């Protein structure tokens, strides 16, 4: 069949009038115009005046994290740099601290709410990173939350291990040791 548009072709959007979409087992099986094919036991949904599109894929999320950093927006709007925000106790390290303190249940509940909201906007698949634990037990905790959500939520999740998001505060004086930890301890335990 035809493949997806690439390059400049992506900008050529095609609208079909009097179109139909046949979905079998949750997957688009065929699309056409004119008379709707007769399929035994099919449910017909009148989508006139609506957009029909495949599920959206969010290919870059930081879904699993503790705390909130909304106060940093005000700081940014007042001209503060990331380094100034970090030195004031914000930035990724503040999220790391909150993520480490959060329970599996807290992380899962927060992420599930975000997934529900994303589904409401048409997203059906997300890539979800670890990367705010920055210690073996906490990175594995985040990946376990992602796995559990993938097993029990309607959203499809694809996990990405991001244990080297940054060098955490406790390793600032010994970056090489943190790289060793990621390579020799964390990565072998990621499944």
Where are these regions (language model features)?
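Metal-coordinating catalytic core of metallo-dependent amide/deamination hydrolases
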Residues: 93-110, 116, 124-191
